[in-house]
Every structure is written in C-alpha cells, then in structure tokens.
Amino acid sequence: MLARALMLALIVAVPLACGDEPGFDPAAPRCLHLPRPPSRDVLQLERVLPDIAIEGGVALLQAPDDATRWYLVTQPGVVHRFGVDGGAAEVVLDLSTKVALAAEAGLLGMAFHPDFASNGEVFVSYTAPGGKVFTSRISRFRSSDGGRTIDPASEEVLLELEQPYSNHNGGDLAFGPDGYLYFGFGDGGSSGDPQGNAQNPETLLGKLIRIDVDGGDPYAIPADNPFAAGGGRPEIFALGLRNPWRFSFDRETGALWAGDVGQNLWEEVNLIERGKNYGWDFKEGPDCFEADTCDETDLVPPVAYYRNISSASVIAGHVYRGTQLPAIAGLFIYTDFYRGTIWGVKPGSEPVVLADAGARGLVGFGEAADGELYALDYQGGIYHLRAASPPEGPGLPDLLSGTGCVAVADPQGPPAHAIAYDLNLDFWSDGASKRRWMVVPDGDSITVDPDGDWQLPAGSALVKTFYRDERPLETRLFVRHDDGAWAGYTYAWDAGGAEATLLGAGETRTIDGQPWIFPDRGDCLYCHSEAAGFSLGLETSQLLRTIPGPDGQPRDQLDALVELGLLRARPTAEPLPAADSDAPLADRARAYLHVNCSSCHRPDGPDGRANMDLRFSTALVDAGVCDQAPRAGDLGLVDARLLRPGDPALSLIHI
C-alpha cells in the first residue's frame, strides 16, 4: 500500500503523499478489511431444505392437521409438496396450461378448507386468459388422497373478475376463524387507480372480500357483510386498498393483518376490519394527495408504514405465535420484496427492525403448525426464522475519522493511501456533487468482467462524499468484506463539516430547507445488485477518460491505474458520453438511462415490473422500450408506451 500510494502521488498528483500527511500513523486504520458493525438483528434467516430450490414460488403453507409437509405454490401454475425434513418434491397440481402468466399474474394463492381432512377441498386464485388483459379467478379443487394430489379436473369456478390492467391483482386467499373465505383484489392496476375502483362499492377491485363457500352455489354471502343488504357488491368486506398482496389471520386473536403495496410514497401494514375504508386512492400512508378535499373521517390509518424509496412491495407475514423466539412473541412480521428488512409491529407501537436480510426477493412467509415462521424467496430459497447470533467484535467506527477512509488533517478529503477517480457521467443525486476514491489492499488488483464491470478484491472499500454548495452532507462507504460480500454504510456530516457519524438506520433530514435521504444499510444493495456488478460506477466505459497529470497535462485514467498495479492490463471499451459532450443527443440520452436506470432495468435486475434493458451496450431495438406497452400501469394516458419515438408526452420513460 505504501509503494502504491507513493506512485499515485507521482502519477496523478494526489495532494498528500503517504507518510507526509500531518498526524500520519502507520498503525492507524487504513480503510482496509473493515469490520461489519455489530449486528442489530434479533432474527436471522437460516436456509433450510437446500435441495428444494424451485423458482417462482409465491406461497408456502401446510394443510390442516398435517405438520409433516409443506406445499409450495409457484407463479407459473404448479403446486409442489415435500416433507418438512426434505426429500423429493412432488407435483400435486399443475395449472400451467390454464394460467395467464405475467409480471404480477399467474397462480397467486392457495388455501385449504378448514375441514380439508374430511372434505378434501382446496381453493386457489389465479389469472386466466380472457377479458381486456386477463381475468382473476377463484376456484375450488378437490383431493381424494389426503393432499398427495389435487385433481385438476375437479375445478369449480367460484368467482371471476376481469382485470383492466396487468398489475395489482392481489391474489392471496385464506380462511378466517369464522370459517369464511377471504380474498384480496388489487385496484385493477395502472397508476393512481384511474378508474376509481378502490372507493367504488359497485366493483370488487381494490377490496378485501369475504364469501361463504359452504352455504351456497357456488357461494353464499355472510349476513354481516357490509353490503349484504345492498348499496354495493355483497362480497365486499373492506375497501380502499391498492394491492393487498399478502394477508393473514392471527391464530390467537383472529385479527386480520394485510400488507397494502404502495405507489410512490408509502408501503402500508393494516389491520383489516369489517366495513372499514383504508383510504386508497386519495390517501397513501399518512399522506393525502389533495389535502383540501381529503376527508379522513371514516378512514382507518395503517398500523405501520414506511417510505418506498428503495422498497416497492410490502410482504405481509404472520403474527408470531411460536415458542422458539420469545423476543418477538405477538409481533406481526413483515418485509419488503426489494429491500429485505424484516420488521415486527404490534398495534399502538412503533415497528422494530428485527433483521436485515438483504435484497433476497422475499415473496412471502409460511406459518408452520407449531407457529414457527419460514420465509420464501422467489429464487427458491426457504428460510427458518431463528434467533440471531450475539454480536462479535468492535465493529465499524462510529466516527468517519476513525475508519482510515479520510485524511486526518482534512476529513473531507482522501487519505494518502487512497486512489481518487472520476467518472464520465454522474448519477443524478438531487443536484449534489460528489468526490470519490477507493482503497484496495496492496498487492491485489481489480478484475474486469466481460461486460466491463470492475470487481474489487475482498478487503477493499469505495468512498463517496456528497456535497451541496460545497457543504458535505453524507459519506457512503461501500465495503467488500473479507468474506467477499458487499455492504453499504452511511456517515452523516455535522453542520460545520468537521466530522461525520455512522447512522444505524436510514432517515430523512431537512438540510438548508431541502430534504436529504440517508439510505438504510439494506437500501444500498437494491441498486448495487449482483446483476449490476455491485460497484456501479466502476466500469470501463465510465472510467475511460483523461485526468490532470502532475505536470498539468491530461493523463489517461486507465493508464494511470495500470501503472499503479490496480489493473493488470488496460481494458478496452467505448467511453460513456458525458452530458455536456459533443456526442450525438441520442447517445447522451442512452448514457443517462444507463447510469440512472440500468442498475435495475437489466437482465436479472431487481425490478421485474418492466421488461427493459437500459444498458448503454444494449442496442435500442433490443432494449424492450420502443413502442412497448407498459406492464405496470400507464399513468392514465391513452395508448401510452414506455418510449414512443417522437412523442415524449406519451412516453412513460420521459414522464
């Protein structure tokens, strides 16, 4: 590291030479091999049943009176069964030829009749071809062998509802303690509920419904349903919901908990009560869209809500009633598909963070017969919620100056052993400017993937400080720990710019009259995903540029990094055009989308709501945007497209 820093001073004229920095201490922290902070987690996810890795799972459940087997419901239309201790997975129901499969469509839910052991009845929800887009369907099936198989020919369709758009289909269903079947419908999709469905009692869209599957043909209406005597659809139990993807009943109290997926502001956790209104489409979380016309008189506020800055889909779980985790007894457990933080909450109390599971793509929770909880991810992983191990080690320093990642004399600047770098095109960050540097263990080098993403060795750190009007706001450390895993940490600067303090959780502060969002640790890996190469800005096309040399003459940045030994060979690529360059406007626009959007919108990226590939290297004809109809809402625009050439007013990317 000493030799590399001295060479750096000669090559790129870093102001501080190693050993000349005031207060330099060779034994001081060097921003290398940084430790993780002591875990704040109460829970950990323990992978179980590793041989059961069936992708596309959306629900995990057990049949009544059978604690020995799990049933896994998959979005493509297949239900599998396997033992709680492992063994081969068996297909018990295959509806793959019947379902209409899309981003939020397919086989979405399943529930066993409470008397399944005697009547063999199973209920499923799925989207079927038909209608403008497709039709949501609730059907009854039967098993004659105790659940080893479910007869596809026994289907009895109970209810169908045409969907006007492809998203917000809800899909969960469950039997309540009253013996009735409950089902959640989204508002019909698009954005902002353009048809006003959630508040319209004459449609089932945007509602939680309740029906009696034992008392009629094909069902009866419970006498105490809110509109059983008229005034709306008699199936309605509660209204004002956007997309209740998952809900569950507390096995001890019978309370009905639901997660309502938000739009642009808030994700909600609600206690659903008969006849109550939950506010969508004029209120989301604590916020009314039009304060002057927002009548909150009869609304039920959410029990919990959180900003969907780097989150996008609340995943409701269950109230924990097991015995292995007394610390979370009675808490309702929930997470987010994109973020992975696991929270717990009780009515009247603030939510608590129980675990940071990372961006695993958790889609649901399964409750075992003994009350223990399991989490399911979309890639096929099944996890048992266990007590977290006690924290070990001193952890990351609370003060940025103690990390070795900044200069002792000037904590806003890089230390002598760091390597500053610059990019062709900055990510937009609310108008903030940035300074960047990296620290790589001496003797190690950076590898370059075939697509140009750079991979730093374990023990490295990336440092980025955000400024507004030359005032430091935040420094982020993106660390590759010694086990090879990446993690992000945020330090918030004091008003005088003298020191920055480690934040334990995300928060929003108003600075000089403007909000600034400090990300939670779980937020970082939403954009800094494996699909995007983790480091984002460190890619050949971004770093292929000139920098000032020690003599004031321009110097090729990649050549300098090769001479430092950080790169074993000079990679080749076309530089990403800067916004103020003389490159063609189309190229500059594609570069903007690459930097600001492609970390999610790419193959295997975290956003599955739009099938776009916005990487600069992808030909526009293959990007999936030109004249493509939106899959997740059209913002109320007639004949909108993701990108309509020559018509920005109907191009959702522009809007």
Stretch-by-stretch model annotation:
Residues N277-S311, T572-A573, A619-L637:
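Flexible internal linker/loop segments at domain or repeat junctions
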Residues P351, A359-G361, P391, L400-S401, ...:
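Sequence context surrounding c-type heme c attachment/ligation sites in exported
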Residues C18-G192, R246-G262, S310-E350, G371-E372, ...:
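Acidic, Gly/Ser/Thr-rich repeat motifs that build Ca2+-stabilized beta-propeller blades
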Residues R137-G146, P201-V213:
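Beta-propeller blade signature
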Residues D20-S39, S389-R435:
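N-terminal pre-domain segments of enzymes
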Residues T135, A198, E202-L205, W266, ...:
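A detector of repeated loop/turn-to-beta-strand junctions in beta-rich toroidal repeat architectures
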Residues E90-A103, S154-Y165, G215-F237, F282-I309:
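Surface-exposed loop and turn segments in beta-propeller and other repeat-based domains
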Residues A5-P15:
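Bacterial N-terminal signal peptides
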